[in-house]
Amino acid sequence: MVEPAIGRNHIRAGRHHGRARIVFARTKNHAYLSHDAYCSRYPPIGRENADRLRIRTVVDRRTGRGAERWHRSPRQANGRFSNQRYSSTSPNSSPACPLIYFISIKAKRIACVVSAVIFVATSCVSPLTGFAFWETNLAYEGESIYNYLQVKNLSDRTILSTNVLFGVQSVTMKDKGLTGMYYDTALAAPALADNANSALILGMGTGTYARQLKQYYPKMNITGVEIDQKITDLAGEYFDEPADIPVTTYDGRAWLAASHDKYDVIMVDAYQDITIPFQMSSTEFFTMVREHLNPGGVMVVNMNMISDGQGSINEALSDTIASVFGNGNTLTADVPNTTNRELFAKKPGSGSEENSMQQASKALNLRETTYERTGSEDLEWYMEEVASRFRKVNEPDSASTILTDDKAPVEVLGMHAIDQIIADEAGPYRQILKDEGFGGLLRAVQ
């Protein structure tokens, strides 16, 4: 951009401020902010020992595009500034460019002032009222190094959410029954396994799955791993996490790498909201999980998004897991009225047909095994309903959809799934808006 010629009559404001003289000027097509500063290359630091640095920010008033130019004049031994200048230009780099642009064009000053007042007011009030200021039943609201955290105390349950507006990360039921969430479907894992004596939970949260396992399998030895220490603290304070369950604050994959223990059930629930960490989605990770299962053991993975079709995130995860556990050993089950899908993968055990995944997942066998191990008729009949939702996952025909440590684009695949979910949810409203206008849309959302 060509720098405009500035005359004395173009100067709008100028003053000395500390060690810098600040000037704002405006021409027909350009505006600029200029100030002299002083920079020292060596001690002692001070204006008398420093070079002069003239900084000029120029903005084209017609386009809003700007650039910043520096002129450095070295100080000579006699104290005067050299006429030799060292200059450099950085286009569109200065944070002052938008400010200069809006001041120079005098655009919508009232709107700018109102917006600034609202911004300042909400910035001051939000730390006092909390992010979810509309909630009236919050027991806790805060942040950890990993998450926004919200504990809500309802009449029948206490829930933990890691999102301001939606979603439930963990829940504890005050009547100690089933939760109505994906944890209930995941209770099929101990019934699918050859034995149900031990369990590892990667992504312990506040211990929802651990509490359910303890309720229905009281003799089971359970170990938890949770990366967020603050969530573990909240589990003890608000969610009655069983005190006899050891919980380690660590990354799930790193914990597996350091452990030699084996388990009958491993729950992978380390996916935050609707995001999936790539290091816990690859063949290398699932191979590590498989090695920590006893023969006949079952891994259950909570997938937060129901996304089908070629190239989807669920296809990639399912194919990756099936490639590790072998053909016929992987099942999925969608969770009703949610966007969750549970995936079960079994490590071959004794080799007998009756212990295979195909046999164990049949409704009658799943019911009988559940009742024999838990004595709960409610859970027994619920498992029959779960069995009706099982879908077999075959090994992939090619390696194109298999995720590895070298190639796991789960962020991109996840965003595609989110876009599809939003499109599906917004579809009916888009049609109402088209047919009935804004009035019809307002009536529809009331």
From Swiss-Prot:
Every PABS domain range: 116-351
Active site: 269 (proton acceptor)
Compositional bias per record (Polar residues), positions renumbered to this chain: 75-94
Any one GO MF annotation of this record: spermidine synthase activity
Stated family: Belongs to the spermidine/spermine synthase family.
Primary location: cytoplasm
Name of the featured protein: Probable polyamine aminopropyl transferase
A GO CC annotation given for this chain: cytoplasm
Subunit annotation: Homodimer or homotetramer.
Reported function: Catalyzes the irreversible transfer of a propylamine group from the amino donor S-adenosylmethioninamine (decarboxy-AdoMet) to putrescine (1,4-diaminobutane) to yield spermidine.
Gene Ontology terms describing biological process: spermidine biosynthetic process
Pathway: Amine and polyamine biosynthesis; spermidine biosynthesis; spermidine from putrescine: step 1/1
Keywords per UniProt: Cytoplasm, Polyamine biosynthesis, Spermidine biosynthesis, Transferase
The keyword Cytoplasm is assigned to this record: yes
Annotated region (Spermidine synthase), positions in chain: 118-353
Catalytic activity: S-adenosyl 3-(methylsulfanyl)propylamine + putrescine = S-methyl-5'-thioadenosine + spermidine + H(+)
Enzyme Commission number(s) from the entry: 2.5.1.16
Gene3D superfamilies documented for this protein: Vaccinia Virus protein VP39 (3.40.50.150)
Subcellular location: Cytoplasm
Lineage top rank: taxon: Bacteria
Region (Unknown), start-end ranges: 1-117
Gene coding for it: speE
